[in-house]
Regions:
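FMN-binding flavodoxin-like domain, especially the glycine-rich phosphate-binding loop
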Residues: 2-8, 21-41, 46-136
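Short N-terminal binding/cap micro-motifs at the start of the first secondary-structure element
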Residues: 14-18
Length: 136
């Protein structure tokens, strides 16, 4: 059975694009035993998080309106030991996302600072490997 990673992003073009690029690295070596699902933070069903073995969060700016419910959820849910990563084009958004998951006790990996345009798949594989384990 494949392990699941959930990628939650705001509606910004940059973060949506990066989320899709991240999802594309799953299903093939070295992450062939993983499947990825990308969901909009706006339409995020909290039950999806419970079935995920790991999760990633991305937004362009701190406190986007789409993350209001997620912020509440993460103050009440226990995700102790679950691998987590955050990505954004802005350092202050990474700080926001990192703080968001703190109370959940998820294991936060190194953040990914993204720029406009495509992100190199080798860089994404290395980043993901650092979060969920595995070499890329």
């Amino acid at each position: 059975m494949k392990r699941k990673i959930l990628i939650i992003a705001d509606n910004c073009d940059v973060t949506k694009s990066v989320a899709k690029n991240i999802a594309a690295v799953f299903g093939a070596a070295p992450f062939a035993n993983w499947s990825a699902a990308v969901v909009s933070a706006k339409d995020f069903p909290p039950t999806k998080l419970l079935s995920a073995n790991a999760f990633l969060l991305g937004c362009e700016k701190p406190e986007p309106p789409e993350f209001t419910d997620i912020k509440v959820l993460f103050t009440h849910i226990n995700l102790v030991g679950r691998p987590c990563g955050v990505f954004s084009p802005q350092a202050n958004a990474i700080k926001y996302l990192s703080g968001l998951v703190r109370d959940s006790e998820a294991v936060l990996g190194n953040p990914l600072v993204v720029t406009k345009g495509a992100v190199d798949s080798r860089k994404l594989k290395k980043w993901v490997g650092g979060i969920i384990g595995g070499k890329a």
